[in-house]
Amino acid sequence: MSLIVQKFGGSSVANAQRVMNVAKIVTDTYKEGNDVIVVVSAQGDTTDDLIEKANEINPKASKREMDMLLTAGEQISISLLAMAIEKLGYPVVSLLGWQAGFNTNKAYGSARIENIKTERLQSELDKKKIIIVAGFQGVNKSDDLTTLGRGGSDTSAVAIAAALHADRCQIFTDVTGVYTADPRKIENAQKLSDITYDEMLELATLGAQVLNNRSVEMAKKYSVELEVLSSLVKEPGTIVREVAKMEKMLIRGVTKDTDVARISVVGMKDIPGNAFKMFSKLAAKKINIDVILQSVGRDGTKDISFTCASSHAAEAVEILEDLFGLEGAVVSSDTSVAKISIVGAGMQSHSGTASKMFGALYEAGINISMISTSEITISVLIEKELADKAVAAVHKAFFG
């Protein structure tokens, strides 16, 4: 007998027919003699709809009250799935995050899981029940409901798998695995049979929508092997593990991220500590910085540009104007950009990867404004309107 954790996203339970389809997948797993814990997201666009309703009432609602509202979405989906499983004649219980033992910190809207008290989960497993858990949520030390942020249900599933030492953690989505590019936009995108944690983490961070990056971080930390597969099509998916078994491809994927802003500070004084002052202030406001470019002038000044999420652009500009505006520096933001990235451990042992990528963009007539590299990633900043064209050109260069 194995313990299987299964996670189903909002699209997998978007309507009654899909809820019944998920119930069939879950009960088929249970019939094989397995213990089953299922983590479910809110149906379809429920979370977005709830946010819209909140904004109609109070656009500046507190994060605590927003979390109270948003946890309602998962409560609906877990109860409907439990009803579907009951209809099929199987023992089942649905649990909210706090009932399942999820304890978090107090960061409303983006809470971190501190621990899971597994007694209730283990008790229900001992009764041979299928357990349906609301993803994306928990409770803090003040007994307030909290949410884990976008993609938090992936993290909930991995956390349960780690806490109970599950034999498998399956992440069901609307695609059949992890692909070399978005298969809905690139016709010859190839499905990967497996991928390393590090490669998957880079893909998730750089714009791939298949897995939440925090869930991959947790899976790597606790050695939870993940399987990404479709709830709509029955076929093998992609395994995410420490070491990929398939022969290393040069790269594993091409991603685009259009939620990007380029922030530029032009004419700041070229003195020790200014860059530290800049990035420490941004870090204090939890603004994550990615690609960085610095150029030094001949008049005792320097220019620094960097990228961050477009949602943080206005706040970043305000911080930097307060820091350097009186010195005569000019701060600006540009959200008409996109980041195109390639990811793959294979590039560590192969030369010419960057030139191949840059050549593909050149042939497509696409200019590069910024470049960032790591051991397994190369990212470039380009015009946003050319993002899809760039992904297609780079994918063709590496995969044909």
Language-model segment annotations:
Residues 1-216, 382-383:
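Nucleotide/pyrophosphate-binding catalytic subdomain
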Residues 43, 175-177, 222-226, 230-235, ...:
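Glycine-rich beta-alpha junction loops
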Residues 237-400:
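A conserved regulatory-domain signal marking ACT and ACT-like small-molecule sensing domains
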